């Protein structure tokens, strides 16, 4: 059964620390949330499911193709750089062109934050998959950080799909779940979220109502 999901696109500004009411230091990530605009509303009657599409970020109109220009014109909004669709049971309550700001969330609520992790380049199995590696003594000959066996010679006689090996690390879509919104600065459009969120400073993040827990 679908539930009511709130969401907003924003930019990760970086981390800092603040003090709570008990005078304890709280590490927080500052996210400049929105403003977003609603560019499309999907309903059960027209699309078979309910969702709302929101847009964020400035873009030169000359860089927008004709189909997208028509899409934004239909919603009577200027072109935006990023689009995302959020499935929610109350999609019909949204209207085209409606603005969504940081006030969507309140302090104390649980959220999931999605972003693109920092790219680390080509990495070995110890860094990429937390392998233990081989022995550190002199008896191990130049194989200290190798993965070990990747499959038998005759049986199975091949390398299984999905076997963890060296390769490019990071630059992937990552979601951190059940983070707490510590504070909301509605005037500046900022969300202060406890803990770290994926991605570099300046990266795009999606803040949504937590799928699990509360």
UniProtKB/Swiss-Prot annotation:
One of its GO terms (cellular component) is cytosolic large ribosomal subunit. Residues 133-154 are annotated as: Disordered. SUPFAM superfamilies: Translation proteins (SSF50447). Keywords: Ribonucleoprotein, Ribosomal protein, RNA-binding, rRNA-binding. GO terms for biological process: translation. The keyword rRNA-binding applies. InterPro entries: Ribosomal_uL3, Ribosomal_uL3_bac/org-type, Ribosomal_uL3_CS, Transl_B-barrel_sf. One of its GO terms (molecular function) is rRNA binding. The keyword Oxidoreductase does not apply. Gene3D superfamilies: 3.30.160.810, Translation factors. It comes from the Bacteria. Pfam families: Ribosomal_L3. Part of the 50S ribosomal subunit. Forms a cluster with proteins L14 and L19. Belongs to the universal ribosomal protein uL3 family. HAMAP family: Ribosomal_uL3_B. One of the primary rRNA binding proteins, it binds directly near the 3'-end of the 23S rRNA, where it nucleates assembly of the 50S subunit. NCBIfam families: L3_bact (TIGR03625). This is Large ribosomal subunit protein uL3. It comes from Streptomyces avermitilis (strain ATCC 31267 / DSM 46492 / JCM 5070 / NBRC 14893 / NCIMB 12804 / NRRL 8165 / MA-4680). The gene is rplC.
